[in-house]
């Protein structure tokens, strides 16, 4: 869930368009792909009218998402401060001579948290944690 990380309204708008059935992909496939319950996704099918069930589901999910993101970023800062030298050596062995960029380091520690377009996660993190 939350593959696009725009904001709650932007996420809902994109998912609504995808579940409307006009994208050439079945609603069931899209629901599985984005982790949305099938019964909620089916309510969005063949319509451009905003679906209240999808909005409610995303609103509940964003509460959990904010908590998880905040925890991940806190861990990220502490992890790199406390384990910097040992971690740098391990990463040099994996990536070669250069240390990977911030987004790659965060992705390694946060099990792949990133946004759809590969934009720096910190921009999105600050947006959600305001």
Describe the role of every protein-language-model region.
Residues 57-121, 129:
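Auxiliary, metal-adjacent structural segments of Zn-dependent hydrolase domains
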Residues 27, 125-129:
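Short, surface-exposed linear patches
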Residues 1-78:
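N-terminal low-structure segments adjacent to metalloprotease catalytic domains
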Residues 7, 122-125:
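Helix N-cap / beta->alpha transition motif
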